[in-house]
Structure formats: structure tokens, C-alpha cells
Amino acid sequence: MISVFDMFKVGIGPSSSHTVGPMKAGKQFIDDLIKRNQFEQTTEIHVDVYGSLSMTGRGHSTDIAIIMGLAGYLPHNVDIDMISGFIEKVKQTALLPINVGQKIVKFDFENNLIFHRTFLKLHENGMTITALDENRTELYRQTYYSIGGGFIVDEAHFGKEEKNTVQVPYPYKNAEDILKHCSDNGLMLSTVMLENEIALNGKEAVSAHLENVWKTMQACIEHGIHTEGILPGPLRVPRRAASLYRALQANTNLSNDPMRVIDWVNMFALAVNEENAAGGRVVTAPTNGACGIIPAVLAYYEKFISPLTPEIIERYLLAAGMIGSLYKMNASISGAEVGCQGEVGVACSMAAAGLAEILGGNPLQVCIAAEIAMEHNLGLTCDPVGGQVQVPCIERNAIASVKAINASRMALRRTTNPRVTLDKVIETMYETGKDMNAKYRETSQGGLAVKIVCN
């Protein structure tokens, strides 16, 4: 079972597949060397990056992420402020301290980390790491795939289902299974997910994790609305959340313009995604590129519907996480595999479901909200300008946040049965993504990415 611990992970920007995943892969490689008793023999490390991971890698800080992973750091606890200085020293010395300084190996930034424009067979995001001894003889080589949302898998385990050692009370493979559990047991969708999570991780751990997820999201919004300036990279995109926040604070009277609610939702989403673009601390929800939608919709609920309680936060994230797990199991949450419908589309679907849940929707209405949100994201391309998670990504999160709220409201006010089910729209999304030309799947070779010139 895909857990909320998997769907919501604290990490750093700008990308879950191109930053968080590669950092975890680098750390995993070092851990493997230690397990194989080859750590001490290693004197040099070589990295080859392929496919979408390569084509947009520099804009997504993939190279930096891999190096930080090899250095022994993980996305959830790496000191963001030390990264630039650490990387600069590696560039100057051609030496890399690995496993938090336990050993120093040769690593020339230009020659030991190579971006290839070719694709590996198993997935669009591939990377191979090789350890060499003092004679430059290969000690160990492993290929990893970053399959979206910060998930990684090595070549030997690719495509193999990871079996839970713990039996959950409500196993499911699709939305139909979930709705049957809810109907048979008189449970809300979030309760079904909670009972499964308790079986896997224990109630205390689940509550602590979800509390930390929301606190991290809140901190991200707060930092975003108080930070101005230009985002990193050649696009020189100015931050907008702070100025929008000031404008909204200056006039809080909604009666003059009820649509100002949308401005607030936009601001929440922009704040989070600007933090992500700047390499800040964010939560994969389910990816970094789509990390603004779920927090923006919950922040909307808190400001305009009702104060948040720990129970409401948990129910929202559990329902959203459960819907996200269906996409992870039966389709993809990787922009490199299925386009932006797998990132912003999935986040929109998750947020719509979460909102419907805490607004009192029954399990069917929650699934209808998720379906509506995805249905109107089908075919969404991933064409980041300059290979960066900025244009169109930041604004797109704001648009999708509003769309999620609308999808939820439409589902709750529907009086007829839908013709399209959530399971069918998930299936359609995956097929659409696989049919999509590769230049629209996070390669920056089509769409806006080739129309907008980076100076």
C-alpha cells in the first residue's frame, strides 16, 4: 500500500523527480557501498544522467542534488544554506567528501558527472553511478530511476511490486475497492485510510507526520508571502506572492469584490511554488512541481470556511493521500512519464477530494470531486521553460488550486450520477500520457519551452 508517508515527504525544491529523487539515489549508492564493504576502497565516483533527468537536469539542480546525496545528505534534513558553498568547494578542488565527510574521493564536476541526451529503456528519468578504486577499476555500479514524487527504484527492482509485510484492514487497488469498504463498513474515505495507516505506522506516528506536513506547508506559505526578489536562473522571474499579499492586506473587504477569494488562493499557491523554485523547504504533494495546490486549498478552507483542527487537517491529508495513492499505483505522478497531468493534474485531484471530505462529502462525492478535477487536466503538457520549475509551473499551481475548489463544489452540489468514474479517468490519464510526444514530457524540447527565449 502507498502510504501518506510516501505521498507527503518533506524535501527541498525545485523538483521531486529531478532533485529529491536524485539526492536520495546518491545517498542510497553510498549506503550500498558501505553494506558491500566497498566504501573504503572507493577513491573516485562517476555519474551518468539520462533522458528527461538529463535534458532538464541543470535547471532542476539535478547535478547538485546527486552530489549532496553522495555527500551523505537527504532532502528532509539537509541544511539548505550550506549547499551552495559546499558545491563551490567541490568544483574548485575536484574532491567530494562522501558520507558526511567520512571519506574524500576524486570528483571533477565537469568530467565525473555527464548529462546524456539518450534515454534508458525502463524509464524517462535514469542515472547510473559507478564507484572506482585507486586503479580506476570498477568496484560497484548501480542504475537508479527517479519515478516521480521523490520515489526511486534501482534497476533490479524496477516494475516489481513492493509487498507490505503488515496486513492492512482495508486493502485496495482502485477507487471501486475503496468505495466498497466505505459502503460495507459505514466509513468515511479518510477513516479507511487512517485505519490502514495505523496498521502500518501506529496512530501516534501518523498524527505526528501529518502535523509536520501541515506545519511545513504553513511555514512555506509564510516565508513565501514575506520574501521578494528574483528567482534563480536565466529567466529572472520575479516573485509575486509578497506584493499580492500586501495588496490583499490593504483591502480585506470581500463585499466589494467576492472574487478576491480567488486572489487569496492564488497567493497561497504562488507563495509555496516560489519557495520551491528557490530551492526552499517544501512538501511533495505529490510532487514538488505541484506542491502549492494541496496547501493552498487547505489554507483557503482555514481562511474562508472554518478554523482548522488537528482532526480536519488529518482528514484532508488522508483523503488527498488516498486519492494520490491510486494515481501512483495505477498510473504515474511523473511529468517525464505522463506530462503535467501526472503532477498538477494529480495534485488538483487530491486537493479536490480532500476539500470535499472536510466539507462533509460522502465517499462517492469525494471520488467524484477527484474525478472532475483530473478530467479537466487531461492532456496537460510538461514544457518547463529553461528546464526550470518556474514558467509555466508556478502560475499553473495557482490555476489548479482554484480548479480543485470548483471541482469539489461541483461534486457536492451534483444531483445526478456521473458517467465517468475516478478509475476510468485515472486509466485515461495514463494512456494519454503515454501517447504524448516526448517533447511535451519534461524534456524542454517542445511547447512553451522552445517559444520563450532565456537570456
Curated annotation (Swiss-Prot):
What Gene Ontology terms describe what this protein does at the molecular function level? 4 iron, 4 sulfur cluster binding; L-serine ammonia-lyase activity; metal ion binding
Which organism does this record belong to?
A: Haemophilus influenzae (strain ATCC 51907 / DSM 11121 / KW20 / Rd)
Q: Can you state which reaction this protein catalyses? A: L-serine = pyruvate + NH4(+)
Pathway(s) the chain acts in: Carbohydrate biosynthesis; gluconeogenesis
Q: What is its EC number?
A: 4.3.1.17
* One Pfam match: SDH_beta
Alphabetically ordered keywords of this record = 4Fe-4S, Gluconeogenesis, Iron, Iron-sulfur, Lyase, Metal-binding
- Family to which this protein belongs: Belongs to the iron-sulfur dependent L-serine dehydratase family.
What Gene Ontology terms for biological process does this UniProt record contain? gluconeogenesis
Family matches, as PANTHER family: L-SERINE DEHYDRATASE, L-SERINE DEHYDRATASE 1
Its protein name is L-serine dehydratase
